[in-house]
């Protein structure tokens, strides 16, 4: 069965979902029937074809009236401001991928269902009232048919949760801290300009900028046992893609750095193949651009202090890896059937 998908919001994640779908060869499993985006179709086609981070899209892209063509595949383009006006029932939409970054609560999900979609997947963290929050590779097997409004968590949650699970299963985590070193994002300024967050009034290309993060809440959403045992901070750096996460955890069992690396390397080759990767090459952030994994462990940076404090560095392409997980989760939701 081919899953009929609509994309609501055609920004960084929405466009990368399309590119990942075509580049990964999953068009027999997923068909995009519509895209809803307030911007004009000419701009949509141009930004899908030409991307500063990911290069030129190999597929032919063209726009004809209110249709976007990728190769010979026609995708209807919509410009609706209200979810209520979206023709999901008419288009036979199975799953809406809401990539707006704006919507994310149950009310918004219910609006998509009322418009005719069978299920909804948000590309960002949602409220506690959603049916499920999924980190693919860790808890996607818990999806059920009645889970109709789902969050795919965040790119950083998808990056760090698999590593936390591996370390906790092996050594027993007592507590931890996380520092996200994240590329600049659309909510920052090119030059100094007004923003409610005074730090984000400053030019993104000229400073390392501390920002708020809800990553600790994202960790406890997946692993409630870590409530009040993880803290997180985040800084934005003057790069346009790829993120590094510094994870430090105290564990119950004594361990050596070499043992931690062996554990993570084996997981990358085995149970987490395709989700977690492992490297000891002397790489820098740009080398992980367009990497489809949720997490790439940098084994050269693993440290252990006092046998119980583990520090690891984990990379991710915060756009491309996450877009691939959106596709994975879509198929996992569809596999549970539609009511």
Curated annotation (Swiss-Prot):
Its EC number is 1.2.1.72. NAD(+) binds at residues 12-13, 318. Its main location: cytoplasm. It comes from the Bacteria. Keywords: Cytoplasm, NAD, Oxidoreductase, Pyridoxine biosynthesis. Gene3D superfamilies: Dihydrodipicolinate Reductase, domain 2, NAD(P)-binding Rossmann-like Domain. The record marks 182 as: Activates thiol group during catalysis. It catalyses: D-erythrose 4-phosphate + NAD(+) + H2O = 4-phospho-D-erythronate + NADH + 2 H(+). GO terms for biological process: glucose metabolic process; pyridoxal phosphate biosynthetic process; pyridoxine biosynthetic process. The active site is at 155 (nucleophile). InterPro entries: E4P_DH_bac, GlycerAld/Erythrose_P_DH, GlycerAld_3-P_DH_AS, GlycerAld_3-P_DH_cat, GlycerAld_3-P_DH_NAD(P)-bd, Glyceraldehyde-3-P_DH_1, NAD(P)-bd_dom_sf. The keyword Cytoplasm applies. Catalyzes the NAD-dependent conversion of D-erythrose 4-phosphate to 4-phosphoerythronate. Belongs to the glyceraldehyde-3-phosphate dehydrogenase family. Epd subfamily. NCBIfam families: E4PD_g-proteo, GAPDH-I, PRK13535.1. This is D-erythrose-4-phosphate dehydrogenase.
